[in-house]
Amino acid sequence: MAKKSMIERDRKRARLITKYAAKRKNLLVEIKTATSLEDKFNLHRKLQQLPRNSAPVRSHNRCTITGRPRGYFRDFGLSRHVLREYALQGFLPGVVKASW
């Protein structure tokens, strides 16, 4: 199980990403359409003044049960350990153990 502080930090990042998403997107569009170099620098400065954790690249996928950051399956939102456990117990409909 991941540390509670790491899980909470990722949740905080997710909240910041949603809060500043529109503002960040508008600034990026303005940067692309700006013609003068000075305008672009000013817009970049505004973009850099946004919180660092509001950038989507800083978020990390984590298992919803354990908070494990590695071995994450996007389709289920679970780590490989929990996915295997749930699949064997029949909690994931349509998921069966492979046999050939």
UniProtKB/Swiss-Prot annotation:
Task: Tell me the compartments it is located in.
Answer: Plastid, Chloroplast
Q: Which InterPro entries match?
A: Ribosomal_uS14 (IPR001209), Ribosomal_uS14_bac/plastid (IPR023036), Ribosomal_uS14_CS (IPR018271)
- The UniProt gene name for this protein comes to rps14
**A Gene Ontology cellular-component term:** chloroplast
Function recorded in the entry: Binds 16S rRNA, required for the assembly of 30S particles.
MF (Gene Ontology): rRNA binding; structural constituent of ribosome
Bilayer-crossing residues are none
Record note on quaternary structure:
Part of the 30S ribosomal subunit.
HAMAP family attached to this UniProt entry: Ribosomal_uS14_1
Q: Which SUPFAM superfamilies match?
A: Glucocorticoid receptor-like (DNA-binding domain)
What this protein is called in its record is: Small ribosomal subunit protein uS14c
Q: Which UniProt keywords apply?
A: Chloroplast, Plastid, Ribonucleoprotein, Ribosomal protein, RNA-binding, rRNA-binding
| Highest rank taxon of the organism | Eukaryota
Q: Which GO terms describe its biological process?
A: translation
Report the sequence similarity comment from the record: Belongs to the universal ribosomal protein uS14 family.
